[in-house]
Amino acid sequence: MKRIYVNEKWCLGCHLCEYECAFANSHLTDMVKALKGKAIHPKIRVEDGGDVHFAVNCRHCTDAVCVRSCISGALSFEDGMVAIDQSKCVGCLTCVLVCPFGAIMPAPEGGVAQKCMLCTDNLTGEPNCVRHCINNAIVYEERD
């Protein structure tokens, strides 16, 4: 199963992946209209640690502690990824606390959890953060 991998040595900390993620999840076709004058709410985030920058995203663990800990059954592992059904999420945010990678975060509206869902339902089949990373620090590939 393909996953997103980040090479922190190549990450410039430009945050373009965050904008592309927010745009992809806006379901609009014009980035300016989708994001102009709005706070962005990406499902990936860039952490800046001085000279080191890296993108934090869901690893889609096969034995995910977030799935096991979800009291409402909103999180599940299906088709090789951890999926979230926000209509089932009760907003306890236990998944936020137990994710060892810090990849699940509270959604700004509704008090439910949000995370990367591998937005591959586009023409290229690659997540937007990968397609638009100007330094190729984010890749979408299969590894052992």
Locations of the language-model features?
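Non-ligating segments of multi-cofactor redox enzymes
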Residues: 1-144
